[in-house]
C-alpha cells in the first residue's frame, strides 16, 4: 500500500502573493512532512526559481512547468503537464505527504481540475481594493480556503477590512477564509492548520 500525497492547488491574480504563501508554507511544514512543488508559468520558470533562491525546499523538489499558452488550460482542461510533473516527483521522493501546485497568474475565473488537486487555496490581496470579494468568481466562492493577503496595505489603499470580511462571508457561506500579512506571518498558522487538517483524511491507495 502506497500513500498518495495530498495535492494542494494555490491560485490567484498576479501579484496577490501566491509564491510568497507557497514559500511560507514550505518553510513551516518541511520539517514535519515530505513536500514537493510544481509551479506554472507561460514561458519561464520564474516562480520555481524564486522558490529555489528562497530555499523553500531543495531544488530537486521544485519543478517548473512552462505551459506555453493559457496557464488556466494547464490546471483545468488539460492537466497532463502537471500530472506528469507530479508523477516525476512521486517517483523520486515517494512517499510524499504533500504536493503544492501553483497556478500561473490569473483572473477570478481560474479553477483547478478535480483530477489535479484535492484542495484549493485562493489568494487575493487587499491592494486590489475591498470590492474584490463581492466580485465573486469560482476562486472567491468555491475555493476550499480564501486567503485575503497584504492586510498591512489596507490603510494605504483605503480598503476597509470590515467590508471585505462581510462580503467574503456573504459570498462563501460556510467556507472558511483568512486575513494574512505574509511579511509578518500574520494568519499563516491558520493556513498551516487548515492544510494539516486534511492530511489524515487521505486514503491509502494500492
Curated annotation (Swiss-Prot):
List GO terms (cellular component aspect).
cytoplasm
SUPFAM superfamilies, per database record: P-loop containing nucleoside triphosphate hydrolases
Question: Is the Cytoplasm keyword given for this protein?
Answer: yes
One biological process term in Gene Ontology: urea catabolic process
Where do the annotations place GTP binding? 12-19
Q: Name one GO molecular function term.
A: GTP binding
Is NADP tagged as a keyword? no
InterPro entries on file: CobW/HypB/UreG_nucleotide-bd (IPR003495), P-loop_NTPase (IPR027417), UreG (IPR004400)
Assigned protein family: Belongs to the SIMIBI class G3E GTPase family. UreG subfamily.
Q: What is this protein called?
A: Urease accessory protein UreG
Amino acid at each position: 500500500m502506497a500513500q498518495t500525497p495530498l495535492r494542494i492547488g494555490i491560485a490567484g491574480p498576479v501579484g496577490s502573493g501566491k509564491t510568497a504563501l507557497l514559500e511560507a508554507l514550505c518553510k513551516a511544514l518541511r520539517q514535519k512532512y515530505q513536500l514537493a512543488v510544481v509551479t506554472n508559468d507561460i514561458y519561464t520558470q520564474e516562480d520555481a526559481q524564486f522558490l529555489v533562491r528562497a530555499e523553500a525546499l531543495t531544488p530537486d523538489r521544485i519543478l517548473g512547468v512552462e505551459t506555453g499558452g493559457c496557464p488556466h488550460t494547464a490546471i483545468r482542461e488539460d492537466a497532463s503537464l502537471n500530472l506528469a510533473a507530479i508523477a516525476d516527483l512521486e517517483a523520486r521522493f515517494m512517499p510524499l505527504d504533500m504536493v503544492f501546485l501553483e497556478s500561473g497568474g490569473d483572473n477570478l475565473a481560474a479553477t483547478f481540475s478535480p483530477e489535479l488537486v484535492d484542495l484549493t487555496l485562493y489568494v487575493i490581496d487587499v491592494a486590489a481594493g475591498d470590492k474584490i470579494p463581492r466580485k465573486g468568481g469560482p476562486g472567491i466562492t468555491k475555493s476550499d480556503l480564501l486567503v485575503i493577503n497584504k492586510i498591512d496595505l489596507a490603510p494605504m489603499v483605503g480598503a476597509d477590512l470590515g467590508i471585505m470580511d462581510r462580503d467574503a462571508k456573504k459570498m462563501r457561506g460556510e467556507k472558511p477564509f483568512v486575513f494574512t500579512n505574509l511579511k509578518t506571518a500574520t494568519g499563516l498558522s491558520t493556513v498551516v492548520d487548515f492544510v494539516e487538517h486534511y492530511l489524515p483524511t487521505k486514503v491509502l491507495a494500492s
